């Protein structure tokens, strides 16, 4: 027996072979288009809101980068999770979104920043959100509750972002002395590769106001990001509900137009045995 129980589902739906074949053709066209749209729109959304912090290595600091990136990244994850869970009961919406985002980012980094603009690829490496996305999907799969997913999965999405990226970006925070000035590796790379807007956009990754809390800047930033990610998950879950729910306006026998959200809105005549 197949893990997806395809034969049982088709038998219960009482679909003729022609309808099954047509459904498969529609899926073969629909889902690749959906993936391409998800890669393009999520990448554009992410670059507009968190682009500067995720573009450059010298902007990946311990304060704003762990705050901004998860808050922006959880938005699409939440909406697509609603769509896949409610319509297909598939708990991999967040992982799918993050993988699509990484595909779009790496295409941009290689062809736009490395091949076209000649920046070194390790200076424009994108951050990863896969650990938090996996926690979102696992929480939804195990609890089957969107509110618990928002509180637990959304919190872990913000908390796991910085430690999940630390093996990749940690070495760029090592100190070096350049002509008598103490810099980090990321700051030094930023001074070597001048970008449009410099010096307006030059910033050192070890400067900021969160140090007034005793120096634990990353911990404070991670917990704040986790809290806001919970709220963002809730908001975008309902946005997914608004934009991913089919509805019908049906005119009744007395001429009254009513709003329906189910496929039986136009009656049960098309079903062989009716709806029980």
Swiss-Prot record:
GO terms for cellular component: cytoplasm; plasma membrane. Its main location: membrane. It comes from the Bacteria. One of its GO terms (molecular function) is monooxygenase activity. Cu(+) binds at residues 187, 191, 204. InterPro entries: NH3/CH4_mOase_suA_sf, NH3_CH4_mOase_A. It is a multi-pass membrane protein. Its cofactor is Cu(+). The keyword Ribonucleoprotein does not apply. It is found in: Cell membrane; Cytoplasm. Keywords: Cell membrane, Copper, Cytoplasm, Membrane, Metal-binding, Monooxygenase, Oxidoreductase, Transmembrane, Transmembrane helix. Pfam families: AMO. The chain crosses the membrane at residues 29-49, 66-86, 96-116, 123-143, 150-170, 219-239. The soluble ammonia monooxygenase is a nonamer composed of three alpha subunits (AmoA), three beta subunits (AmoB) and three gamma subunits (Cytochrome c1 PetC). The physiological significance of the two gene copies is still unknown. NCBIfam families: AmoA_BACT, CH4_NH3mon_ox_A. This is Ammonia monooxygenase alpha subunit. It comes from Nitrosomonas europaea (strain ATCC 19718 / CIP 103999 / KCTC 2705 / NBRC 14298).
């Amino acid at each position: 027996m197949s893990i997806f129980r395809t034969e049982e589902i088709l038998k219960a739906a009482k679909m003729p072979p022609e309808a099954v074949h047509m459904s498969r053709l529609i899926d073969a066209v629909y889902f690749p288009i959906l993936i391409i749209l998800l890669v393009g729109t999520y990448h554009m959304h992410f670059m507009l809101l968190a682009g500067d912090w995720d573009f450059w290595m010298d902007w990946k600091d311990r304060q704003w980068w762990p705050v901004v990136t998860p808050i922006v990244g959880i938005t699409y994850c939440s909406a697509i999770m609603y769509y896949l869970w409610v319509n297909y009961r598939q708990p991999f919406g967040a992982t799918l979104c993050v993988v699509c985002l990484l595909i779009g980012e790496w295409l941009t980094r290689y062809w736009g920043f490395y091949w076209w603009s000649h920046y070194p690829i390790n200076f424009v490496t994108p951050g990863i959100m896969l650990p938090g996305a996996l926690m979102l999907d696992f929480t939804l799969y195990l609890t089957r509750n969107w509110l618990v997913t928002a509180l637990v999965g959304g919190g872990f999405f913000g908390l796991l972002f910085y430690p999940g990226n630390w093996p990749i970006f940690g070495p760029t925070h090592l100190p070096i002395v350049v002509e008598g000035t103490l810099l980090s590796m990321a700051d030094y790379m930023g001074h070597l590769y001048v970008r449009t807007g410099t010096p307006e956009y030059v910033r050192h990754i070890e400067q900021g106001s969160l140090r007034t809390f005793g120096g634990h800047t990353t911990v404070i930033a991670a917990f704040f990001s986790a809290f806001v990610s919970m709220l963002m998950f809730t908001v975008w879950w309902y946005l997914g509900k608004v934009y991913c729910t089919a509805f019908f306006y049906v005119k009744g026998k007395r001429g009254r137009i009513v709003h329906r959200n189910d496929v039986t809105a136009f009656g049960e005549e098309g079903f062989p045995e009716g709806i029980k």
